[in-house]
Every structure is written in structure tokens, then in C-alpha cells.
């Protein structure tokens, strides 16, 4: 459904438009008679499931793909639609299921309460091992990195440009306060610090179906976002060790990892390429392009960086306020997508000129 300036559709901005935008940017150069380098497009459709199919294909087509000068990924965006945004860093991801079992069948809570510990209370004890409940700070040292001073400087610059819109974009209840005291602290926390989210639960009946029963088990799906530079496999191993050691009350406790992905930190773009993006942005928007970070995870970015260590990386896109990616009213911002198409054309042409 198109209702300007939006194109509505599940998967539209995250990120079904990417292949079309890339193809159109090359077509524009061909129609204008502008030389361009060889462009190879990889369209993979399991990114939301961890990109497990991608490594075998990269390996199988190593000779055909060669060593790219630049890898372009359109799965990002920024805090407004006025600028062209380039993502310099992405957080990684560690997730798994924390299971606590205390009995083989449900027991009357009046008869057992006070003698058998609740599996939910044991979950709370275990969660306190990895997160400070009052602040949300993740307490696993291996999930933290030293935050460079330039990150704080860039966060202040972003604050000055976008102001409170970063917080205001979220559909929170009116009385909710943000975790951080300042906007720049919030920007850094969203991108360069680890966070824990409980994203699912089993063993809990609905409120309507709940009875006076001490339940056998509580299972929680834990999702840790980790900053770039953290080894995700080591981090998930440490999480498992911390959560499973010395189970409270001798309960059966297991943490079963199901996904891990490293974060990403892009190397600087070459001068001519950076200049081409800047010129295109100024021509199209009247504003310079801006670098930002994304607290989310694109698993294949670190994977591609490991495969092509000498390549430049341009991670960009038109995700922004109100697009509601993964939501029922997900939508693509058409004007900024058109501008990005032209900017990408200019970038591709600049690569050809400097080969």
C-alpha cells in the first residue's frame, strides 16, 4: 500500500527494498553512460534467522565473487530522514534459553509454598548474576569494551543534531523515563554497551488460566546485545558458565545458547569515496552525510568483514523514525530511498574512477 511518503508492507524497510535499490543505482549509471565497476549482488533471505546459509555460498562462489573493493549493505538507517546516514558500528548478539526446573509435576501452592522454592524466584536470582536490576547494567565483564573518547565526542555531535527525537521515536507510555540521564549517554548505551532483554517465556500460563499451583519450571529466552569488539562465542560461553554454576537450592538449571553473532566496526572510507558521498549528499539534501551507529545486529557484517578484510564497507539504508520494522505497519520512506539510490550511484561511479 502506498500512502505518500510511505510504502507500507511487512519487510519493506527491513529490508526488502535493498536489492531493488542496488539494481536501480547501477541502472541509472548505465542509462547515463557513466562507467561503473563490476557489481555483484548477493540477495539472501535468512538474515533475520542468523544468515546461516551465507557462509557456504560465500565459500562456494569465492572465485566468482573475487576480492571486492567495497561491500555495500542496505540494512540500516538513522535518526532522521533529512540526512544520508552511514552506519559505522553495529552491536552483536548472544541469545539462549535459561531453564529452571524444581519439580516433576505441579503442586498446590498452599501446601508447597514456603518449602519448595519457586522456579520464577530462582530465575530472578540467576538474572541478578548477569544484570543489575536497578540500572540494567550487564555485569558480565567479557561483554564490555573500553569505549573510545571519539565515541563520546560523536555521541555529543549526534545529540546536537537529532536532540530528543531518538527517545521520542519510541511508542512508550507517557510516564516512562529513559534509563540514561543525558541524551549522549543514551546514544552510547544503545550502541556501545551490552544490554539484556527477556524476549520470551515458557512454563507460565496466561493470567486467565492461572491456578494456585507451584509450577514445575520457568524458561526464559534471554537476548544480550553486545558492543563491537566482543567475541560472541566467548561471551555466550561465559554467560552459560555464570548462569549454570552453583544452582540455587540445587534446582535443575540449564542455559542453552541458540545464536551468537559478533558486532561490526567499519574501517574509514577512502578519501575519493568519502568525497563522492559527501558531494552527492550536499546536492540531494543540502546537508552532509553523517556517521551513526546501530544498536541492532546484522550478523553477516562481521562475517563479510572477516571474509574480505581489505574491502571498504558502506552500511547504510533508509530505516528511520516511525518505520516500525518488524511491526504490522512496517513502512519504507520513499523520498529518502530515492535520494539514497542516487547517492549510491555516485559512490559506485567514484569507485570506478579510482580503480
Question: In which residue ranges do the predicted regions lie?
Answer:
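Flexible glycine/proline-rich, aromatic-decorated loop/lid segments
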Residues: 85-101, 313-316
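Short small-residue beta-strand/loop micro-motif enriched in glycine and branched aliphatics
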Residues: 8, 104-110, 207-208, 325-327
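Acidic/histidine-rich catalytic neighborhood of metal-dependent amide-processing enzymes
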Residues: 6, 11-89, 355
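A generic structural motif
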Residues: 13, 104-106, 224-232
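An extended, acidic, His-containing surface patch that forms the Zn2+-binding/catalytic region
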Residues: 80-81, 138-217, 225-238, 246, ...
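Short, solvent-exposed loop/turn segments at the edges of secondary structure
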Residues: 36, 67, 89-95, 191-193, ...
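Short glycine/serine- and small hydrophobic-enriched flexible loop segments
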Residues: 24-31, 125-129, 224, 345-349
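Polar, glycine-rich mid-to-C-terminal structural blocks
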Residues: 97-99, 103-171
Amino acid at each position: 500500500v502506498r500512502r505518500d511518503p510511505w510504502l507500507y508492507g511487512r519487510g519493506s524497510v527491513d529490508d526488502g527494498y535493498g536489492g531493488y535499490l542496488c539494481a536501480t543505482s547501477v541502472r541509472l549509471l548505465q542509462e547515463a553512460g557513466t562507467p561503473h565497476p563490476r557489481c555483484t549482488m548477493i540477495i539472501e533471505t535468512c538474515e533475520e534467522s542468523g544468515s546461516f546459509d551465507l557462509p557456504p555460498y560465500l565459500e562456494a562462489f569465492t572465485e566468482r565473487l573475487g576480492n571486492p573493493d567495497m561491500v555495500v549493505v542496505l540494512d540500516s538507517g538513522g535518526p532522521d530522514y533529512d540526512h544520508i546516514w552511514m552506519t559505522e558500528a553495529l552491536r552483536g548478539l548472544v541469545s539462549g534459553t535459561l531453564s529452571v526446573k524444581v519439580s516433576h509435576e505441579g503442586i498446590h501452592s498452599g501446601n508447597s509454598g514456603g518449602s519448595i522454592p519457586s522456579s520464577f524466584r530462582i530465575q530472578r536470582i540467576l538474572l541478578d548474576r548477569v544484570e543489575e536490576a536497578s540500572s540494567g547494567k550487564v555485569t558480565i565483564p567479557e561483554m564490555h569494551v573500553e569505549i573510545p573518547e571519539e565515541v563520546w565526542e560523536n555521541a555529543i555531535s549526534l545529540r546536537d543534531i537529532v536532540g530528543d527525537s531518538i527517545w521520542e521515536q519510541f511508542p512508550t507510555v507517557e510516564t516512562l523515563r529513559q534509563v540514561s540521564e543525558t541524551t549522549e549517554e543514551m546514544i552510547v548505551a544503545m550502541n556501545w554497551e551490552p544490554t539484556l532483554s527477556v524476549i520470551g517465556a515458557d512454563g507460565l500460563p496466561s493470567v486467565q488460566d492461572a491456578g494456585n499451583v507451584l509450577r514445575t519450571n520457568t524458561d526464559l529466552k534471554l537476548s544480550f546485545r553486545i558492543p563491537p569488539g566482543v567475541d560472541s562465542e566467548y561471551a555466550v560461553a561465559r554467560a552459560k558458565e555464570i548462569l549454570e554454576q552453583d544452582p540455587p537450592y540445587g534446582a535443575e538449571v540449564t542455559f542453552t545458547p541458540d545464536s551468537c553473532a559478533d558486532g561490526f566496526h567499519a574501517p574509514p572510507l577512502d578519501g575519493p569515496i568519502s568525497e563522492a558521498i559527501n558531494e552527492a549528499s550536499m546536492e540531494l539534501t543540502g546537508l552532509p552525510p553523517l556517521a551513526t551507529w546501530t544498536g541492532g545486529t546484522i550478523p553477516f557484517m562481521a562475517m563479510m568483514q572477516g571474509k574480505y578484510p581489505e574491502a571498504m564497507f558502506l552500511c547504510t539504508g533508509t530505516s528511520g523514525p516511525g518505520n516500525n520494522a518488524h511491526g504490522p505497519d512496517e513502512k519504507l520512506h520513499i523520498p529518502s530511498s530515492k535520494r539514497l539510490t542516487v547517492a549510491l550511484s555516485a559512490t559506485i561511479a567514484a569507485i570506478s574512477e579510482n580503480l
